[in-house]
Swiss-Prot record:
Family: Belongs to the NnrE/AIBP family.
Cofactor binding note from Swiss-Prot or TrEMBL: Binds 1 potassium ion per subunit.
Function: Catalyzes the epimerization of the S- and R-forms of NAD(P)HX, a damaged form of NAD(P)H that is a result of enzymatic or heat-dependent hydration. This is a prerequisite for the S-specific NAD(P)H-hydrate dehydratase to allow the repair of both epimers of NAD(P)HX.
Subcellular localization(s) per the UniProt record: Mitochondrion; Secreted
EC number, as in UniProt: 5.1.99.6
Positions of (6S)-NADPHX binding: 115-119, 184-190, 213
Name this protein carries in UniProt: NAD(P)H-hydrate epimerase
Gene3D superfamilies (UniProt xref): YjeF N-terminal domain
Pfam families: YjeF_N (PF03853)
YjeF N-terminal domain segment(s): 61-270
GO biological process: lipid transport
Organism: Danio rerio (Zebrafish)
GO molecular function: metal ion binding; NAD(P)HX epimerase activity; nucleotide binding
Alphabetical UniProt keywords: Isomerase, Lipid transport, Metal-binding, Mitochondrion, NAD, NADP, Nucleotide-binding, Potassium, Secreted, Transit peptide, Transport
């Protein structure tokens, strides 16, 4: 095992094993741009899109997921792979390797105990293939073969796993970006440790945060004004209602797997993805 500072030339232990419709067009947030500009050599182009995509409540989002698994015979790992690839693609579009001041382009991927965490593991693997240097923090690993397999895949690609959450100043020093894959749309109730402390540290960092589906700690429908404020949100399947409160620079839609009949049933009004793209920028 190595220390994070030793691994990155700076010390933490790591192991290499181990519904309503909203139509909006909004300019990229200048405040967010100022906060994160010191981590970029240039600001990526912000492509605007005007779309009337439907924003989902928690119950409706769960119903769509259940139908994908039951009526349409998708498997969990199948959708997880598509979702994780979408997340990595969105990150690559918003924060190209060549735009980051730090080299190599290190990304901290923080994974929760559920499917959102699985999306994060897939995202980390694809980020590695895209030329980034991801590290994974996975403090509560489920005892399920699917998640064990995803962890092994990362380990085989020499993606290090941290043993504890770095302090905010160390994250700012070592990383260019944090991917928040802790809690998804099914999250309810109070945040339990160690995730409470993790979210506390994330609120202190200055490097950009890219949240998967929901900013962790947010109410799926009401948001959380005192919670983390990501620079990027990657909504999966369709945005959730809390996404209307997102104030970051990049809002992407990912998970290009919704059958047309299901889209019509729930009146999702999904945008037309260009060409073979697996993500679509909503703001």
């Amino acid at each position: 095992m190595l220390g994070v500072r030793a691994l990155f030339g700076i010390g933490l232990l790591v192991t290499s094993r181990g519904g309503f419709v909203l139509t909006h067009t909004r300019a990229c947030s200048s405040a967010a741009s100022n906060i994160y500009s010191k981590h970029l050599t240039h600001r990526p182009t912000c492509t605007m899109a005007n779309t009337g995509v439907k924003y989902l409540g928690q119950e409706e989002a769960q119903q769509i997921d259940e139908e994908l698994f039951s009526d349409f015979s998708f498997s969990v790992d199948q959708l997880m792979e598509l979702a994780g690839l979408s997340c990595a693609t969105a990150v690559a579009k918003g924060y190209p390797v060549t735009s980051l001041l730090k080299s190599p382009a290190r990304v901290l991927v923080i994974c929760g105990p559920g499917n959102n965490g699985g999306d994060g593991l897939v995202c980390a693997r694809h980020l590695k293939l895209f030329g980034y240097e991801p590290s994974v923090l996975y403090p509560k690993r489920p005892n399920k073969q699917l998640f064990q397999n995803l962890s092994i895949q990362c380990q085989k690609m020499e993606i290090p796993f941290l043993t504890e959450m770095p302090e905010a100043d160390l994250i700012d020093e070592a990383y260019s970006l944090v991917v928040d894959a802790i809690f998804g749309f099914s999250f309810k109730g109070a945040v339990r440790e160690p995730f409470g402390e993790i979210l506390s540290q994330l609120k202190k960092i200055t490097v950009p945060i890219a949240s998967v589906d929901i900013p962790s700690g947010w109410d799926v429908e009401k948001g959380c004004p005192d919670g983390i404020q990501p620079d990027m949100l990657i909504s999966l399947t369709a945005p959730k209602k809390s996404a209307a409160l997102f104030k970051g620079r990049f809002h992407f839609l990912g998970g290009r797997f919704v059958p047309p009949v299901l889209e019509q049933k729930y009146q999702l009004n999904l945008p037309q993805y260009p060409g073979t793209e697996c993500v679509f920028q909503l703001n």
